[in-house]
Structure formats: structure tokens, C-alpha cells
């Protein structure tokens, strides 16, 4: 009997009295985006075939033919010679049809005890597991680049901001280490997400399992899964792992976006804290002087794109009854694009950070503005017995006086300072000016997590050790 798969193109066409319309074929086909799953689809099929042979469900000869045919198909795909067909819907049926054309009936036996429902769920998990590992490596590369730049700038002083107003002096190295912490949490989330990705759905079949004596644990071991999905209904319909990964990716991009905003600000000529290498910037078609930080700007924009993919996946799943529904075909494009966007962004940012030129003089000049050591003066008074709230009020008055005169606290003479702060004049000595220097301010924050240069160097060392584990 002629196979329906080859007579009409669809694996299920014997049930229907008329062929699918061309419009519906285009509307329902996924092959031109899910073909990126081809190699993991082959890996999953080979593991399934080996299990079928071990369980005496197919013969050793069938297995040998399947392995031979899959090797040829894999080569065709890798060389770009495989002919993908819209009529065959998706990556799975394209490969199965080619296998059957190469080896005959043995190819038709491969799908025994399996549905495309558990097959695609397995493929996505296999593929995503590898991509999570790749993204983990890229996060490590970016953290390494940030640590190098932080170490080089452990003593470089810049203004720290709250509300985008000058707050207190910090070191540039300390500032960069904040992003190392963010990306470290991202790496932890990716590793944690991987544990839930790494469960095998294969064996759930369409939704209820299969009557064949399969060995799911053997397949899981072959494919490197930590275990199997425990419920067949959940196994084929679950996309939590894709949502969780996309949520973790949205956080990665949020951290990249925050960093991008600062890079754009720091590179502005009105700030001038850094310069980004030319190879990461573009010019203007009309303004000859322009050097635009397009990479961080685009990263900000692409963050919204990944956030949108997260909402798309959440919305995709919210109304689905058990078990598998065709809606789930729409999981792939958001997931694929999220992976591509995050991976490309992390790779380019690691390279860009390594090429940043720091301008310490501009940073220092900015830190000298805005009364960044006012808190240090308040702390000075507290250490001499004044309650903090009283010290805060006294220094706030001194700041207002200096602001009216257009000078900084450190520009006052000792006599002027005592004159402006008569209620605490007896507490103020010549040593006060050591507290009002930028170097004195940052050096005084000499505790774990503080901005003192020694703490920055210690934090860099600890972070490098953690990266190496």
C-alpha cells in the first residue's frame, strides 16, 4: 500500500476527504523556523530507536538502517543540502520522510511508541539545554571583562548617584562590581532553570503514554537528562521551562539595559567619563562630528523585545486545557529569538567592555561637585559625640551656605567652618579636612561590600575564584 506520507504529503491525511488548502499549509507550517531543531531531533530519534531495539520492539536490522539513514540526513543538513518541504509541515516529518525515502519500511517504524507531541517537547528541551550552557559561558565572559575593568579602576574615583544626583564618592571599580553581582545572579538563575529543563518528556506519546514496553529511563540516560517527566499529560503540554528561561533572559536583558543607560550617559560629551571603541559605534549621515553609542542603545531596545516574548509565552499558555494544543507551535519563535538576542547581546557586550577607555580626570572632577563628602562631615561629627540627626542638620546648613557662595565644603577654612557651625564648633578640628577629601571618603568604607580600593580588589579576587569554580 502506498504510504499516505508520500502520496499526499501529510502523515495524517488518510482520515480526510480533501487535501489541505495551500493557505492553511502556509499558516500551520513551522518547518522554516523549527528546522533549527533538526540535529537534536536526530539525536532524540536515535536514542528512541536504540531503546526500541533494546526492548525488542524493532529489529537490530531496522536500528542499523535507521542509524545509517540518520547519519546521511545529518550530513545533508550540516552541508546545507537537505531539501526542506513546506508540505511536510515541520522538522520532524521532513526528517522522517527523508529517512523513509532512504531506508524504506524501517524508517516508518521509527515513530513506534512516539508522538510528535512528546517528540517536539524533547527536542525543545534538548536544544534549550545546550543554549543555556552557551549563555552561561557568555555570562562568564562578560563578568570576566567587567572584573578586569574593575580591577584596573579600583582606585578611580567617580560620583555615586541617587536620583541621578551626586550622592557620595565611589570607585569606578566598585560601581562595575555591582553589575558583576547582577550577572552572577543571572548565571545562577540559568543554572537553576536548567535543572527543570533537563527532564525527558519522550515516552508520554500523544498524551496518555504508550502500550509498548518502552524504557524511558534508558532514553533519558542516553540523552543526558537528569530524569523523566513524571506525568504524561504534563510532559507534552508543559512549557513552564520555556517561560522560566525567557523570564531569566528578561532579567539578563534588564541588567544589560541598566548598564547600557549608564554607558550612553557616561559617553555623552557633557559627562565624558568613558569612551567606547569606534568599532562599537556609528556616525551620522548629516552631522560629521557624531559618534553614537548604537550598541548600548540597541540593547536597551532589544530588552523590550525579550520582555515581549515573555508576555507572549505567558499569554500563549494561560488558556490551554490539557493536554497538547496547536497553540504550542507558537512557543518556538519567541523562544528562539530570545536565545539569539541574549546570546548576541552578551557576546558583543563582553567585547565592548574590554575596549572601554576610562577618563579618570573627568570622573574625579564630577565627584568634586555636588557636595559628595557631606555625609563624611556628618559622620565626623557623630564620631565626636553628636547625635546623627543633629549632625545631619548642621551639615545641611553648611551645604546651603557653601552652595550660595558657589564653593564646596572643603573650600571653607577651619575658622569659616566653625563660624558657620557655631553649635558644633568645639567638635571641629584641623583633621576634619581629611574626611572631606575624595580619597579619604572612599577609603573609610573599608568593609566587605564597601567601596574602599582594598575592598574592591578583594571582591574582584573573590569573584574571579567563583567564576573558576
UniProtKB/Swiss-Prot annotation:
GO terms for molecular function: argininosuccinate lyase activity. It holds the Pfam family Lyase_1. It is found in: Cytoplasm. HAMAP family: Arg_succ_lyase. GO terms for biological process: arginine biosynthetic process via ornithine; L-arginine biosynthetic process. One of its GO terms (cellular component) is cytosol. InterPro entries: Arg_succ_lyase_C, Argininosuccinate_lyase, Fumarase/histidase_N, Fumarate_lyase_CS, Fumarate_lyase_fam, Fumarate_lyase_N, L-Aspartase-like. Gene3D superfamilies: Fumarase/aspartase (C-terminal domain), Fumarase/aspartase (Central domain), Fumarase/aspartase (N-terminal domain). Pathway: Amino-acid biosynthesis; L-arginine biosynthesis; L-arginine from L-ornithine and carbamoyl phosphate: step 3/3. Belongs to the lyase 1 family. Argininosuccinate lyase subfamily. It catalyses: 2-(N(omega)-L-arginino)succinate = fumarate + L-arginine. Keywords: Amino-acid biosynthesis, Arginine biosynthesis, Cytoplasm, Lyase. Its EC number is 4.3.2.1. The keyword Amino-acid biosynthesis applies. This is Argininosuccinate lyase.
Amino acid at each position: 500500500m502506498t504510504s499516505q506520507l508520500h502520496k499526499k504529503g501529510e502523515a495524517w491525511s488518510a482520515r480526510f476527504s480533501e487535501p489541505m488548502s495551500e493557505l492553511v499549509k502556509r499558516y500551520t507550517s513551522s518547518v522554516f523556523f523549527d528546522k533549527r531543531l533538526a540535529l537534536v531531533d536526530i539525536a532524540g530519534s536515535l536514542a528512541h530507536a536504540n531503546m526500541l531495539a533494546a526492548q525488542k520492539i524493532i529489529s537490530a536490522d531496522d536500528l542499523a538502517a535507521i542509524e545509517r539513514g540518520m547519519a546521511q540526513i545529518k550530513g545533508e543538513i550540516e552541508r546545507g543540502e537537505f531539501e526542506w518541504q513546506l508540505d511536510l509541515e515541520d522538522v520532524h516529518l521532513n526528517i522522517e520522510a527523508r529517512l523513509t525515502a532512504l531506508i524504506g519500511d524501517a524508517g516508518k517504524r521509527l515513530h513506534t511508541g512516539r508522538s510528535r507531541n512528546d517528540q517536539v517537547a524533547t527536542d525543545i528541551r534538548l536544544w534549550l539545554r545546550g543554549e543555556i550552557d552557551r549563555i552561561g559561558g557568555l555570562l562568564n565572559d562578560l563578568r570576566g571583562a567587567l572584573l578586569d575593568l574593575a580591577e584596573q579602576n579600583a582606585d578611580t574615583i567617580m560620583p555615586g548617584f541617587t536620583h541621578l544626583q551626586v550622592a557620595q564618592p565611589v570607585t569606578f571599580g566598585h560601581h562595575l562590581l555591582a553589575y558583576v553581582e547582577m550577572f552572577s545572579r543571572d548565571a545562577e538563575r540559568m543554572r537553576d532553570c536548567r535543572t527543570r529543563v533537563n527532564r525527558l518528556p519522550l515516552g508520554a506519546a500523544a498524551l496518555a503514554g504508550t502500550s509498548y514496553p518502552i524504557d524511558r529511563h534508558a532514553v533519558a540516560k542516553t540523552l543526558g537528562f537528569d530524569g523523566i517527566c513524571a506525568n504524561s499529560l504534563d510532559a507534552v503540554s508543559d512549557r513552564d521551562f520555556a517561560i522560566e528561561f525567557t523570564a531569566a533572559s528578561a532579567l539578563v536583558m534588564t541588567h544589560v539595559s541598566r548598564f547600557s543607560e549608564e554607558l550612553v550617559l557616561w559617553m555623552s560629551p557633557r559627562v565624558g567619563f568613558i569612551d567606547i571603541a569606534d568599532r562599537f559605534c556609528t556616525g551620522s549621515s548629516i552631522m560629521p562630528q557624531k559618534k553614537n553609542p548604537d550598541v548600548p542603545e540597541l540593547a536597551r531596545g532589544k530588552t523590550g523585545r525579550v520582555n515581549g516574548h515573555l508576555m507572549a509565552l505567558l499569554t500563549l499558555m494561560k488558556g490551554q486545557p490539557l493536554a497538547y494544543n496547536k497553540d504550542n507551535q507558537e512557543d518556538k519563535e519567541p523562544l528562539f529569538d530570545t536565545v539569539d538576542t541574549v546570546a548576541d547581546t552578551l557576546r558583543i557586550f563582553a567585547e565592548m567592555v574590554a575596549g572601554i577607555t576610562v577618563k579618570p580626570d573627568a570622573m574625579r572632577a564630577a565627584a568634586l561637585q555636588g557636595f559628595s563628602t557631606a555625609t563624611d562631615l556628618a559622620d565626623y561629627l557623630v564620631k565626636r559625640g553628636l547625635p546623627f540627626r543633629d549632625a545631619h542638620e548642621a551639615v545641611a546648613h553648611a551645604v546651603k551656605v557653601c552652595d550660595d557662595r558657589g564653593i564646596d565644603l572643603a573650600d571653607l577654612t577651619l575658622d569659616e567652618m566653625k563660624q558657620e557651625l557655631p553649635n558644633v564648633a568645639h567638635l571641629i578640628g584641623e583633621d576634619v579636612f581629611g574626611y572631606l577629601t575624595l580619597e579619604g571618603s572612599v577609603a573609610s568604607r573599608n568593609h566587605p561590600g564597601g567601596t574602599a580600593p582594598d575592598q574592591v580588589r578583594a571582591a574582584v579576587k573573590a569573584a574571579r575564584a567563583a567564576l573558576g569554580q
